[in-house]
């Protein structure tokens, strides 16, 4: 029996070599490795093992450094949180400066810190009347700051920690009407023309600004409502505030007359600044004649202060652009004593007169104020309107109230025509014989 191995043919050996090369290529083993001897491969393997150990130690070191950095960041975040819970020192930003990185380094210093800074620096003035230069602004983005901003700074490092809301006079904040009036245009009788003029001048530019832009016209800056007392000026302003979603600021003319010099002018400035911040907004100035009287020579300090307040109002009326969402409504019953500078075009452009109601308007007013009452069907409002000659809107409402009180006094369940007639007599008895509204 022959146990000797049979010699392989050259073709079989070549096929095996080709198979080995194919498997090496599939495994990613290069031709260089295949040509290496066993000792060289062992040596190469040891080198790779040592490199792997070095890389593992490097990864471990970087992991420890990362954990240390995370701990440091957490510690610094806790410190920042503690600093932000401490009381702030209120300051004002006076100026923002750009640092030029191309400035030459200062002599005599190994490292010039000023030349390495980039970005913005700030100059602030604290509430203790001290001015500081901040090379590093702090935790607030420098792009969001502007001169005049109110900021809170750390009392030790003076770094800016947070921006504070703009400060306004507390009296101006109280002028903002929080609760919307409930009046509607349908609650106003006999003033259809005045309602249309007010809507065109105030409401349309705020709600449909594109209509004015398409025509290329500028809407009026403000409206002056004038007429005798009791004709519905303040009522129409309240209805306008109820129908628009704008912020409504109500100023009374006597509020702007203050004892200290410049106090009234500051109130006017703060009111317009608050209106601009909360735009769209409407500023209603009632009793404008308290500060808008004609200027005259006077040695009294009080008269000069009133004139200063009016000049500030003129400045604010000229100051804001007509396309902004801030509108002014002024009301007075003494238009004859107002300063001509207030009445010129470009300030209070639209002037709306509120005359005494005619017979039809008086009937409509009494119907409006009687619609919630239990009224008898035989009440003739046209006859009541003829009997209330020279009555204004407020007196027509007083007639309805007096009629209700008379019916209540006699224990009735509904109001009759005679109750209204007695109410007219009651109001006429209280009315002065000679009531002059204009000089």
From Swiss-Prot:
Recorded superkingdom: Eukaryota
Locations listed in the record: Cytoplasm; Nucleus
An annotated GO BP: positive regulation of transcription by RNA polymerase II
Sequence positions bearing Phosphoserine: 9, 376
Stated family: Belongs to the AAA ATPase family.
Complex formation: Component of the 19S proteasome regulatory particle complex. The 26S proteasome consists of a 20S core particle (CP) and two 19S regulatory subunits (RP). The regulatory particle is made of a lid composed of 9 subunits, a base containing 6 ATPases including PSMC3 and few additional components. Interacts with PAAF1.
Protein name, UniProt field: 26S proteasome regulatory subunit 6A
Organism of this sequence: Rattus norvegicus
The gene coding this protein: Psmc3
């Amino acid at each position: 029996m022959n146990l000797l191995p049979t010699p392989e043919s050259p073709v079989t050996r070549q096929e095996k070599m080709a198979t080995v090369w194919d498997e090496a290529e599939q495994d990613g083993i290069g031709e260089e490795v295949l040509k290496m001897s066993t000792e060289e491969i062992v040596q190469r393997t040891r080198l790779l093992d040592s490199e792997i150990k070095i890389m593992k130690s490097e990864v471990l070191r970087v992991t420890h450094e990362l954990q240390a950095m995370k701990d440091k960041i957490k510690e610094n975040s806790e410190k920042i949180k503690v600093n932000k819970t401490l009381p702030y020192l209120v300051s004002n930003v006076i100026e923002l400066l750009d640092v030029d990185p191309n400035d030459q380094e200062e002599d005599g210093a190994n490292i010039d810190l000023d030349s390495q800074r980039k970005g913005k620096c700030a100059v602030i003035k604290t509430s203790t009347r001290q001015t500081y230069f901040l090379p590093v602004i702090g935790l607030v983005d420098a792009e969001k700051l502007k001169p005049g901003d109110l900021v809170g700074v750390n009392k030790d490092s003076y770094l800016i920690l947070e921006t504070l809301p703009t400060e306004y006079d507390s009296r101006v904040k109280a002028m903002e009407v929080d609760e919307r009036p409930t009046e509607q245009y349908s609650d106003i009788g006999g003033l259809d023309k005045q309602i249309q003029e007010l809507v065109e001048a105030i409401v349309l530019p705020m709600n449909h600004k594109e209509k004015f832009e398409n025509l290329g016209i500028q809407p009026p800056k403000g409206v002056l409502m004038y007429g005798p007392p009791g004709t519905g000026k303040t009522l129409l302003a309240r209805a306008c505030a109820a129908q628009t979603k704008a912020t409504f600021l109500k100023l009374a003319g006597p509020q702007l007359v203050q004892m200290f010099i410049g106090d009234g002018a500051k109130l006017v400035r703060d009111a317009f600044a608050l209106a601009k911040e909360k735009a769209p907004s409407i500023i209603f100035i009632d009793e404008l004649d308290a500060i808008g009287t004609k200027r005259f020579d006077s040695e009294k300090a009080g008269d000069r202060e009133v004139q200063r307040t009016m000049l500030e109002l003129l400045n604010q009326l000229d100051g804001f652009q007509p396309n902004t969402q801030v509108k002014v409504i002024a009301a007075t019953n003494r238009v004859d004593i107002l300063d001509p500078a207030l009445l010129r075009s470009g300030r209070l452009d639209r002037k709306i007169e509120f005359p005494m109601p005619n017979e039809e308007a008086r009937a409509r007013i009494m119907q409006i104020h009687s619609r919630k009452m239990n009224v008898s069907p035989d009440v003739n409002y046209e006859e009541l309107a003829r009997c209330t000659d020279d009555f204004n809107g407020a007196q027509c409402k007083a007639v309805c109230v007096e009629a209700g009180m008379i019916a209540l006094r006699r224990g009735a369940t509904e109001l009759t025509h005679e109750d209204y007639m007695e109410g007219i007599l009651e109001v006429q008895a209280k009315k002065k014989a000679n009531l002059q509204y204009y000089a």
